[in-house]
Amino acid sequence: MSEENIKFYQGTDDLSKSNNEETLKLIKQKVFDLSNMKNIHFLLGAGVSSGAIPTMKEFIVEIEEKIKTQQKQQEVFKKLKENNNENLENILGVLYAKRDYQLGINEPDKDTDDLIEIIEQTIFEKINIDLSDTSYQAVIDTYKTFYQKVTYRNKDLSRVNIFTTNNDLFNERVLDNLNINYNNGFGGGLERFFNPARFGYTFSKKIETSIEKYEALDNMIYFYKLHGSINW
């Protein structure tokens, strides 16, 4: 089987080189250059964790395997796939709405409840992995390299905003390991609570003991989990 070519686009321009090694070098240089822009935001998708967390298609296959002996659930799931572009989040949204409707008319639907439970359990099992497992080290190293590049930059540049659609905890584990300060919108101690207003806070440290003089914390990350988290 021939090696798949890596494609790299900037807008509509194909910047890919004749071989993958040269393309990867170009991508690394472009990311390095962009990380030094004054205002920079990153959106991390499923591909970043794909070496450890299944892709959407792999989740679909896993769920289909679990319901292969349940004809009614198979039929419902097939229709949901076709009408929602095989997007599990959209599929769950439809199922949640149906469950609420059935409860609203006092006619609970066990098949709907069971299918929701199977999907939720499959996602939880595959995302809630042991991050200390050495088989995931390559993924952790990728995250480490990324955060070291984007956070240890000129402190006069604006804060870095990281957005992710992933539910896993690779970001948090690496940020903790690298001792990087981050704000994920949560406050509190024993009982954590989400307060989106915290994303507007500036975190500073006192630099003069005799006067009220402060400077912003170095390497501060503002971290947004757009689709929630496995530990919420």
Report the location of each language-model feature.
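Alpha-helix termini
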Residues: 31-34, 150-157
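Extended, H/D-rich, highly charged conserved domains that either
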Residues: 83-113, 153-232
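A short, well-structured juxtamembrane/interface segment
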Residues: 23-29, 137-151
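An N-terminal structural lobe/cap that precedes and organizes the functional/catalytic core
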Residues: 21-71
